[in-house]
């Protein structure tokens, strides 16, 4: 959080940083369905990321997940899980990452933008062990 705190201060962003496990924070009334946007990197399959992130997003907000080249197929495969969690089908945007000095070309990523159109059912997010064992 130190880096994020410094970055937000330097950019003069009016944000609140919260350090919590997503599966716990997503059940807290003070955090549940309170945020306009939640983001995630490609650290898990989309149904898992959606279960962690969509409970934080209020209706009318968005969940944005960064994925690799297979992002479009992953979005299609996860549509049922996303809908169960209150999300609309993902809109897929292709972006190019800046070229680092040690690379010759920019890398492509997919931003999966999921609009929150309904409340996430109270059963979600489930405990992390159950999410890992039985993804939606």
State what each model feature region is:
Residues 76-136:
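SAM/dcSAM-binding transferase cores
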Residues 1-2, 71, 75:
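Short alpha-helix immediately C-terminal to the canonical SAM-binding loop
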Residues 14-16, 62, 88-91:
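Conserved beta-strand segments of alpha/beta enzyme cores
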Residues 4, 67, 114:
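Residue-level signal for inorganic ion chemistry
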Residues 22, 43, 66-70:
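Short strand-turn motif at the edge of the Rossmann-like AdoMet-binding core
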Residues 57-59:
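Helix-to-beta-strand junctions that scaffold the AdoMet/dcAdoMet cofactor pocket
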């Amino acid at each position: 959080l130190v880096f994020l705190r410094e970055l937000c201060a330097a950019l003069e962003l009016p944000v609140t940083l919260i350090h919590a496990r997503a599966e716990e924070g997503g059940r807290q009334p003070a955090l549940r369905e309170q945020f306009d946007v939640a983001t995630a990197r490609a650290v898990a399959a989309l149904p898992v990321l959606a279960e962690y992130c969509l409970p934080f997003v209020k209706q009318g907000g968005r969940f944005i997940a960064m994925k690799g080249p297979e992002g479009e197929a992953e979005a299609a495969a996860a549509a049922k899980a996303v809908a169960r969690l209150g999300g609309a089908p993902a809109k897929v945007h292709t972006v190019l990452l800046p070229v680092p000095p040690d690379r010759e070309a920019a890398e492509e990523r997919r931003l999966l933008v999921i609009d929150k159109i309904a409340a996430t059912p109270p059963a979600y997010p489930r405990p992390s062990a159950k999410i890992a064992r039985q993804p939606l």
